[in-house]
Amino acid sequence: MRLGDGATRFTTDLDIARASAIDDFSEQLAGSLAAGWEGFTGALVEERQAHPKGVPSQYVMQPFSVKPLYNGKPWVTVDLEVGHNEIGDADEPDFVSPEDANAVLENLGFPPLGPIPVMALRHQIAQKLHAVSAPSSMRAHDLIDLQLLDKAYEGDYSDVRETCMRLFAYRKMQAWPPTIAGGAEWETAYADQLPSGDLILNVSDAISWANSLIGRIDAAR
């Protein structure tokens, strides 16, 4: 949403961080979906939470299915993954105008949306670095996201370093600074999700770039 459709990796789900208790969040979201907007309504369905081996339960996202309707007719299902507010990542969002979505809405005769809260880039970078550097990580696609996020980030790396140190300490898994090693299936996974644009073309070079990024972040004071 921050970078636009043409400059991001395609994904079919939506990840968000909640600033309230999960029951309060789901109740408020379900109410908003029922109230609707411009003929759109929806239903919220809680799905079974995964229990991946070696991952503490407090770090596992709570999945939901969002089932939108237009004038009472279903037309799509959106997979929603809801995380909790680990180190304040939901407390200080950036607000961005969804220009691509607004262009589509206006072409269809709907009013544009106002600014939407999105996670601050320093938190996104920290979370991606933690996920992609985890032991036995299967998240080669995070290397793509990190390149896009780094291009968009205009702040001082010292802020990113402080956020990374806090997140890695909070999750108590691998230590900061980590080293990204890659995996057996990363080459195919990376190539399959690589969008067009000025990005690194092969996974080995992307891993080297990401480890260099970690070094630059850790050196910032």
Where are these regions (language model features)?
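Acidic Asp/Glu-based divalent-cation binding sites
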Residues: 15
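Periplasmic plug
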Residues: 12
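Structured mid-to-C-terminal alpha-helical surface segments
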Residues: 2-8, 18-221
